[in-house]
Amino acid sequence: MNIIQGNLVGTGLKIGIVVGRFNDFITSKLLSGAEDALLRHGVDTNDIDVAWVPGAFEIPFAAKKMAETKKYDAIITLGTVIRGATTHYDYVCNEAAKGIAQAANTTGVPVIFGIVTTENIEQAIERAGTKAGNKGVDCAVSAIEMANLNRSFE
């Protein structure tokens, strides 16, 4: 049996990051965590491009556009959606998730889902570097692994 898996060596990888500006008090921390993890794993700072979009709903569009350029080995998406009093939360979360999956599946470039979806602000803060770690770090590590896995199929 052959086992195929990606490694966590970021040297030589080009990574795109799409960040939603809405709730930027959280998304900026996710971005910092992702950038730090990429650098610690050997990705050169000049090989990281960051695109800011208004919010989580717009992330799939920019992620797909970045992936279509074929300049990137992986795309990381970072956003925060916090439940409010209306059903808006459900629509944004569902469509963002579908769009991110579609971007990966139609382009052949790994697109990592890094949209933090929470019931309240406290949960979002916990996932941006306090009790629950930093989801930006997790996404960066996943991007490196998936980029290297994808390369092994070429």
UniProtKB/Swiss-Prot annotation:
Pathways involved: Cofactor biosynthesis; riboflavin biosynthesis; riboflavin from 2-hydroxy-3-oxobutyl phosphate and 5-amino-6-(D-ribitylamino)uracil: step 1/2
Instruction: Quote the EC number.
Output: 2.5.1.78
Binding-site residues for 5-amino-6-(D-ribitylamino)uracil, renumbered to this chain:
F22, N23, A56, F57, E58, T80, V81, I82, F113
Keywords, A to Z, come to: Riboflavin biosynthesis, Transferase
What the entry lists under CDD domains is as follows: Lumazine_synthase-I
Family of the protein in this entry: Belongs to the DMRL synthase family.
Which HAMAP family does the protein's record reference? Answer: Lumazine_synth (MF_00178)
**Name this polypeptide is given:** 6,7-dimethyl-8-ribityllumazine synthase
Name the source organism. Bacillus subtilis (strain 168)
The beginning of the lineage is: Bacteria, Bacillati, Bacillota, Bacilli, Bacillales
